[in-house]
């Protein structure tokens, strides 16, 4: 098998020599090192954005249907030298077989590395990013921080063409919506349905109420897009001009003609501060769109005219934008005095864009310390370009900080973690999470692990037995949790401890689980970590039974999170009942055994019911085998010992007789339906009880009213 892999390597190295390299060696500059030459850019372009550079949601949307429909075709395209197909094949070999996606590529790190190298020689963005992550973490390649940070820098500057220097304030989704919540769909503010309702409300308010703020809000949604709502520049321009037209009536529908009309026929100044602010926002954004080429060809003169209108309304960002244009030498020669004066006025208003422009000016003058101060202020306000400049400043002197800023910049520009994936169907969303996780995005690693985590269902881990499918999913989840835990993510450390405690995806190792919980509690006080430590001390799992230490850890859990009050109260009661000094201890142990027997009976009852309902036997309930590649398209499958992850294999002896005796497991039952049915049954019972009590209360009130009427009569 080693000889086979060696021959395959030689084959692909030979093919690399004869492939046509698209684009050659990639050369890059910092964003806006030199002015944009309007004549060199086609109409509709945006800073000469390369068509090959896509955000991750766009890449997944375009490629996932092709992978599911005909993975062999994608493999053939990779053999022909297509860099995108080579990257996708490399990721499939890195991820291994996935029955949920219907993809059966074997896990083969050597082949994955070969395809990545082939794609990277053509400067394909995502291949370079994947190699950078592998070099930094020593995944299937020797660890090299210098090589990793060098590749991160190359990727960051390669995708800088997607950044709009003046108006690109991309939110840091990972910071605003941490995956510690474990379910992004609960983020109601980003619900697609809610966004649609807001858009309809704003339309009605803007058109019927002639409200300038509603027009600005609608234009913002159409300019930048939202989950489930694509960008529409024409509608954005329409609403920006509609907002301006409420004050400057009669202006044309063309941005260039509109600004000429405003300059030739000046109207009265806005009557309120809110109106002036809305007008200045519209003027500033129209200027940015003109400069960035979103209105056609990049037009610095038109942009300058709109920025001047914003300055006349005392808009600080418009002042910073004109200072930026003076600095870049767009419509006029560089004017140091004008730059200084405009920036001083904008900085006095604490304008984020002013800090970004001031940082760039300081960088050009060699004032690194002053530039760092200004750029960090801009970064704290969400300015995306400044993140790249800070990363460049730290490059070579502080690789740790440089890597952190490069990762942040790349993740936000390529949208490696974004709420847009909420609108994807479950399979596409799962593929996006796994692909982003392989590229090193922390939040996606946690979501990819959660997608395959068998411990997320209480019924699945308590009532139903574990089997090979459960352990296979657990190993995939454990792989991603391990990558996140290596970056000190608290919940991932706790999850790995759970897997070792329960023996999911690995043999049960309570002592190792205890060490993971202790590490999580030491890095950052976590109520869940303290709760797990208390539970292990209470039951003597991995450590001797110690009620005092259990109580101490339970108290720490309550101290760090008041939501643990009920759980801690029940734990204290449980310890009091199970204490050897209490005469309740024997009763408590008997109740525990009865409960366990009841769960086993429920387990066997459900399994037997499905056996009875399946006349062809339990094997007929198994999902179909995923489609495989044709023999002539796929290399030979490698030896599992050569490609297995550094994760312990499950100890089948510890699974018990349930693995061999129970033929049909929960993994082939619609788990969501079963859990939903159980919860619905509980809700119905509780609802009936409450309804009955309410009816009795109403009947009692009615009787009392009748008695009072009779007494008055």
Swiss-Prot record:
<feature type="compositionally biased region" description="Polar residues">
    <location>
        <begin position="631"/>
        <end position="652"/>
    </location>
</feature>
<feature type="repeat" description="Sel1-like 4">
    <location>
        <begin position="280"/>
        <end position="315"/>
    </location>
</feature>
<keyword id="KW-0325">Glycoprotein</keyword>
<comment type="function">
    <text>Component of the endoplasmic reticulum quality control (ERQC) system involved in ubiquitin-dependent degradation of missfolded endoplasmic reticulum proteins.</text>
</comment>
<feature type="glycosylation site" description="N-linked (GlcNAc...) asparagine">
    <location>
        <position position="314"/>
    </location>
</feature>
<feature type="repeat" description="Sel1-like 6">
    <location>
        <begin position="527"/>
        <end position="562"/>
    </location>
</feature>
<dbReference type="InterPro" id="IPR011990">
    <property type="entry name" value="TPR-like_helical_dom_sf"/>
</dbReference>
<protein>
    <recommendedName>
        <fullName>Putative ERAD-associated E3 ubiquitin-protein ligase component</fullName>
    </recommendedName>
</protein>
<feature type="repeat" description="Sel1-like 3">
    <location>
        <begin position="212"/>
        <end position="248"/>
    </location>
</feature>
<feature type="repeat" description="Sel1-like 2">
    <location>
        <begin position="125"/>
        <end position="160"/>
    </location>
</feature>
<feature type="glycosylation site" description="N-linked (GlcNAc...) asparagine">
    <location>
        <position position="211"/>
    </location>
</feature>
<keyword id="KW-0732">Signal</keyword>
<comment type="similarity">
    <text>Belongs to the sel-1 family.</text>
</comment>
<feature type="repeat" description="Sel1-like 5">
    <location>
        <begin position="490"/>
        <end position="525"/>
    </location>
</feature>
<keyword id="KW-0812">Transmembrane</keyword>
<feature type="glycosylation site" description="N-linked (GlcNAc...) asparagine">
    <location>
        <position position="48"/>
    </location>
</feature>
<feature type="glycosylation site" description="N-linked (GlcNAc...) asparagine">
    <location>
        <position position="123"/>
    </location>
</feature>
<keyword id="KW-0677">Repeat</keyword>
<dbReference type="InterPro" id="IPR006597">
    <property type="entry name" value="Sel1-like"/>
</dbReference>
<dbReference type="GO" id="GO:0005783">
    <property type="term" value="C:endoplasmic reticulum"/>
</dbReference>
<keyword id="KW-0472">Membrane</keyword>
<dbReference type="GO" id="GO:0000836">
    <property type="term" value="C:Hrd1p ubiquitin ligase complex"/>
</dbReference>
<feature type="transmembrane region" description="Helical">
    <location>
        <begin position="671"/>
        <end position="691"/>
    </location>
</feature>
<dbReference type="GO" id="GO:0036503">
    <property type="term" value="P:ERAD pathway"/>
</dbReference>
<keyword id="KW-0256">Endoplasmic reticulum</keyword>
<feature type="signal peptide">
    <location>
        <begin position="1"/>
        <end position="20"/>
    </location>
</feature>
<dbReference type="InterPro" id="IPR050767">
    <property type="entry name" value="Sel1_AlgK"/>
</dbReference>
<feature type="region of interest" description="Disordered">
    <location>
        <begin position="621"/>
        <end position="655"/>
    </location>
</feature>
<feature type="repeat" description="Sel1-like 1">
    <location>
        <begin position="83"/>
        <end position="124"/>
    </location>
</feature>
<keyword id="KW-1133">Transmembrane helix</keyword>
<dbReference type="Pfam" id="PF08238">
    <property type="entry name" value="Sel1"/>
</dbReference>
């Amino acid at each position: 098998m080693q000889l086979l892999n060696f021959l395959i390597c030689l084959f692909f190295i030979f093919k690399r020599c004869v492939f046509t390299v698209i684009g050659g060696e990639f050369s890059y500059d910092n964003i806006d090192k030199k002015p944009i030459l309007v004549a060199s850019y086609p109409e509709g372009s945006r800073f000469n954005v390369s068509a090959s550079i896509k955000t991750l949601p766009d890449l997944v949307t375009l490629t996932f249907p092709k992978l599911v429909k005909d993975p062999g075709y994608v493999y053939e395209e990779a053999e022909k030298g297509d860099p995108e197909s080579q990257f996708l094949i490399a990721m499939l070999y890195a991820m291994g077989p996935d029955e949920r996606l219907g993809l059966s590529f074997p896990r083969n790190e050597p082949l994955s590395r070969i395809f990545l190298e082939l794609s990277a020689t053509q400067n394909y963005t995502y291949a370079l990013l994947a190699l950078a992550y592998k070099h930094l973490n020593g995944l299937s390649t020797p660890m090299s921080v210098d090589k990793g940070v060098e590749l991160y820098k190359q990727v960051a500057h390669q995708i800088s063409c997607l950044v709009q220097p003046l108006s690109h304030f991309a939110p840091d989704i990972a910071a605003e919506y941490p995956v510690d919540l474990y379910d992004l769909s609960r983020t109601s503010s980003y619900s697609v349905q809610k966004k649609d309702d807001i858009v309809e409300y704003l339309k009605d308010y803007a058109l019927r109420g002639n409200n300038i703020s509603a027009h600005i809000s609608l234009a913002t949604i159409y300019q930048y897009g939202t989950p489930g709502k694509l960008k529409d520049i024409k509608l954005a321009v329409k609403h920006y001009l509609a907002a301006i037209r409420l004050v400057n009536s009669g202006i044309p529908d063309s941005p260039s003609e509109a600004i000429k009309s405003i300059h030739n026929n000046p109207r009265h100044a806005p009557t309120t501060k809110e109106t002036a602010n809305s007008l200045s926002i519209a003027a500033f954004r129209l200027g940015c769109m003109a400069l960035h080429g979103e209105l056609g060809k990049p037009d610095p003169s038109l942009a300058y005219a709109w920025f001047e209108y914003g300055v006349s309304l005392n808009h600080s960002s418009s002042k910073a934008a004109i200072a930026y244009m003076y600095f870049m030498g767009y419509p006029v020669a560089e004017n140091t005095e004008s730059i200084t004066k405009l920036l001083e006025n904008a900085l006095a208003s604490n304008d984020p864009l002013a800090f970004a422009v001031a940082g760039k000016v300081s960088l050009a003058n060699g004032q690194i310390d002053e530039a760092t101060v200004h750029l960090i202020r801009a970064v704290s306000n969400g300015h995306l370009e400044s993140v790249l400049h800070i990363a460049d400043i730290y490059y070579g002197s502080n690789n740790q900080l440089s890597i952190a800023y490069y990762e942040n910049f790349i993740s936000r520009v390529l949208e490696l973690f974004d709420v847009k994936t909420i609108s994807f169907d479950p399979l596409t969303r799962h593929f996006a999470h796994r692909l982003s996780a392989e590229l090193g995005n922390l939040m996606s690693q946690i979501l990819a692990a959660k997608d395959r985590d068998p411990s997320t269902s209480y019924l699945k881990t308590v009532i139903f037995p574990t089997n090979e499918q459960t352990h296979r999913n657990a190993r995939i989840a454990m792989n991603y949790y391990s990558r996140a835990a290596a970056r000190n993510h608290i919940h991932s450390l706790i999850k790995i401890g759970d897997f070792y405690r329960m023996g999911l995806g690995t043999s049960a190792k309570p002592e190792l689980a205890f060490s993971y919980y202790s590490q999580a509690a030491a890095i950052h006080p976590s109520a869940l970590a303290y709760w797990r430590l208390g539970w292990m001390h209470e039951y003597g799992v991995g450590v001797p039974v110690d009620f005092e230490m259990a109580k101490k850890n339970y108290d720490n859990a309550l101290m760090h999170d008041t939501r643990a009050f009920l759980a801690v109260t029940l734990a204290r009661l449980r310890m009091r009942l199970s204490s050897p000094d209490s005469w309740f201890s024997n009763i408590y142990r008997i109740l525990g055994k009865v409960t366990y027997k009841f769960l086993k009976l429920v387990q066997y009852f459900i399994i037997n019911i499905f056996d009875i309902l399946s006349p062809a036997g339990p094997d007929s309930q198994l999902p179909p085998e995923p489609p495989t590649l044709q023999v002539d398209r796929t290399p030979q499958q490698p030896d599992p010992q050569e490609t297995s992850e550094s994760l312990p294999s499950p100890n089948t002896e510890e699974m018990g007789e349930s693995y061999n005796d129970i033929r049909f497991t929960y993994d082939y039952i619609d788990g969501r339906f079963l859990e939903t049915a159980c919860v619905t049954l509980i809700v119905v019972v509780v609802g009936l009880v409450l309804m009955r009590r309410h009816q009795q209360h109403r009947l009692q009130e009615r009787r009392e009213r009748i008695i009072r009427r009779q007494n008055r009569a």
